[in-house]
């Protein structure tokens, strides 16, 4: 497979660290992702409350959609921008923007202000998650990458667990729903300070002005227009438009033209393309990207619509609906750690991905049976199956893509993977919302048709009214789960495309596995504490400790 040569103007940022320093860096990334995931998963629990408070019953899905769209747009850019400006500078900057955006969410006085702040949160938060993976790939060899990324998983899942609980708690406090954002903002500031001190950094070889010239501005602009136009259009018909109106058709047309322009720019014009099209010429990578998209769809649709199912159909409390997310997210930490250890010891990633996708398919099919009378034990077991599937497949897919591409493409491949994951998540939310509202429009009794415009806030209905609309809600939510099941089927088809050839399947430029320790400055984990890892003099620093000098291994002192 031929690969486009990456310009050498990009400064080297790979810096394998000694074990003790490596653990500190990984734990720092874990703390940051803990904070990000509290915000990410706490919002869905608060949607009905926010809708009532701000009078946003007709548009409250945009609290999540605006964040996901912004995350998707900017996830395309962070990989290449970090190649140009450096990982640490971009990472810390994103944390500061995230903290300011969270504060703005807490002080939002209108739906539009809230959605704007959520978009800013998505633009920065998506970059933080994206760069966390890229930074980890800089400091850990491919063979150990799954193992150390599994160390980060508990922080992410803990944030996923704490998010709904904290959100439900503050919703009942005098701070109301605003308290969640007022809590996260200072945590973001502390994370920025911590990351600024601890994370390794490199000194760019060019000036800031020279680096600005390298940015693929045309590609960035056209990709933004294409993504925003598409996402706004697909979120509209079920919620805001009576069918495919002229506005929707116009948005899709503009998006299509922008997408074609983006492809041409990346193919012919860009010196440092945002997404090198050569990676899509690798069948294995293309299949894995498709699976990443569908995995994101199913996972995010569950995170957003399980609370809707619990509160609006089953009439369970926000606390119970938050607890109901435990099976789908808490189990991921254990499964991710097991998968990481397995990949490090076996040198294979295929088994965990195949097992995860199979369980995701089974769980999604079983989920279509959720209804008003479904036993809670059945609900919990099905969500556990889906959680195990996501945990087994999600991070190993990153390793698989990196195993099929060059080291010089590492950041953009990781960025592309996150783009497809976020795009799948965004489509999962907005398309599921459109399906929900479209079904309600055709299923609700005539006296309750108006509820199709505000399906997320039913607090004002009495028990008789709730019983009258329950069949329509049951049908609408089932249609949402059927769409997720279809996405799971598509995800399973990707298993027949790629092969697991182990870490040795990568181009020779990428062979930084553990077996190549003498040539690459990598050694086995149990020997890392007695080794000093050195690189070319690229002014790489770890906090206040330097890690420069030539690329070689020295034992002891």
From Swiss-Prot:
GO terms for molecular function: transmembrane transporter activity. It is a multi-pass membrane protein. Residues 505-557 are annotated as: Disordered. It comes from the Eukaryota. GO terms for cellular component: plasma membrane. Gene3D superfamilies: MFS general substrate transporter like domains, Multidrug resistance protein D. The keyword Iron does not apply. Keywords: Membrane, Transmembrane, Transmembrane helix, Transport. Pfam families: MFS_1 (PF07690). The chain crosses the membrane at residues 22-42, 59-79, 89-109, 120-140, 150-170, 179-199, 217-237, 245-265, 269-289, 319-339, 346-366, 379-399, 419-439, 479-499. InterPro entries: MFS, MFS_dom, MFS_trans_sf. Signal peptide: none annotated. It is found in: Membrane. The keyword Transmembrane helix applies. Residues 505-523 have a biased composition (Basic and acidic residues). MFS-type transporter; part of the gene cluster that mediates the biosynthesis of squalestatin S1 (SQS1, also known as zaragozic acid A), a heavily oxidized fungal polyketide that offers potent cholesterol lowering activity by targeting squalene synthase (SS). Belongs to the major facilitator superfamily. TCR/Tet family. This is MFS-type transporter clz4. The gene is clz4.
């Amino acid at each position: 497979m031929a690969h486009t040569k990456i310009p050498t103007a990009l400064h080297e940022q790979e810096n394998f660290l000694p074990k003790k320093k490596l653990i500190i860096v990984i734990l720092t990334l874990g703390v940051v992702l803990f904070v990000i995931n509290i915000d990410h998963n706490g919002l869905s629990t608060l949607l009905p409350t926010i809708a009532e408070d701000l009078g946003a019953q007709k548009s409250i899905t945009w609290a999540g959609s605006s964040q996901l769209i912004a995350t998707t747009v900017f996830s395309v850019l962070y990989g290449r921008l970090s190649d140009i400006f450096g990982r640490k500078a971009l990472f810390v900057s994103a944390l500061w923007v995230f903290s300011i955006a969270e504060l703005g969410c807490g002080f939002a006085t209108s739906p539009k202000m809230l959605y704007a702040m959520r978009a800013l949160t998505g633009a920065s938060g998506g970059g933080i998650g994206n760069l966390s993976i890229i930074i980890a790939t800089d400091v850990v060899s491919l063979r150990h990458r799954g193992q150390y990324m599994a160390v980060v998983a508990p922080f992410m899942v803990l944030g996923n667990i704490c998010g709904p609980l904290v959100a439900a708690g503050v919703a009942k406090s005098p701070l109301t729903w605003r308290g969640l954002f007022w809590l996260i903002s200072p945590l973001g500031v502390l994370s920025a300070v911590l990351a600024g001190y601890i994370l390794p950094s490199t000194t760019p070889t060019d000036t800031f002005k020279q680096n600005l010239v390298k940015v693929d501005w045309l590609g960035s602009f056209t990709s933004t227009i294409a993504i925003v136009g598409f996402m706004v259009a697909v979120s509209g018909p079920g919620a805001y438009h009576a069918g495919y109106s002229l506005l929707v058709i116009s948005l899709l047309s503009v998006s299509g033209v922008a997408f074609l322009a983006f492809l041409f720019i990346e193919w012919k014009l860009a010196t440092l393309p945002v997404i090198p099209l050569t990676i899509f010429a690798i069948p294995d990578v293309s299949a894995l990207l498709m699976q990443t998209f569908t995995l994101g769809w199913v996972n995010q649709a569950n995170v957003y619509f399980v609370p809707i199912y619990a509160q609006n159909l089953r009439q369970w409390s926000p606390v119970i609906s938050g607890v109901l997310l435990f099976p789908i997210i808490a189990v991921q930490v254990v499964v991710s750690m097991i998968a990481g250890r397995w990949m490090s010891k076996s040198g294979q990633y295929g088994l965990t991905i195949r097992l995860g996708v199979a369980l995701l398919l089974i769980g999604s099919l079983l989920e279509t049976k959720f209804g008003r009378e479904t036993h809670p034990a059945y609900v919990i077991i099905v969500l556990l199956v889906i959680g195990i599937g996501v945990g087994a497949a999600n991070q190993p897919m990153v390793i698989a893509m990196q195993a099929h591409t060059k080291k010089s493409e590492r950041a953009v491949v990781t960025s592309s993977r996150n783009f497809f994951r976020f795009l799948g998540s965004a489509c999962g939310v907005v398309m599921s919302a459109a399906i929900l509202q479209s079904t309600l429009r055709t299923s609700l009794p005539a006296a309750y048709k108006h509820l199709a415009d505000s399906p997320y806030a039913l607090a004002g209905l009495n028990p008789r009214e709730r019983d009258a609309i329950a069949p329509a809600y049951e049908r609408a939510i089932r249609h949402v789960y059927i769409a997720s099941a279809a996405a799971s089927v598509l995800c399973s088809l990707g298993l027949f495309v790629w092969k697991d050839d182990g870490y040795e399947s990568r181009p020779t430029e990428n062979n930084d596995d553990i077996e190549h320790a003498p040539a690459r400055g990598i050694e086995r984990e149990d020997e890392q504490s007695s080794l000093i890892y050195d690189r070319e003099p690229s002014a790489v620093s770890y906090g206040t400790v330097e890690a420069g000098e030539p690329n070689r291994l020295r034992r002891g002192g």
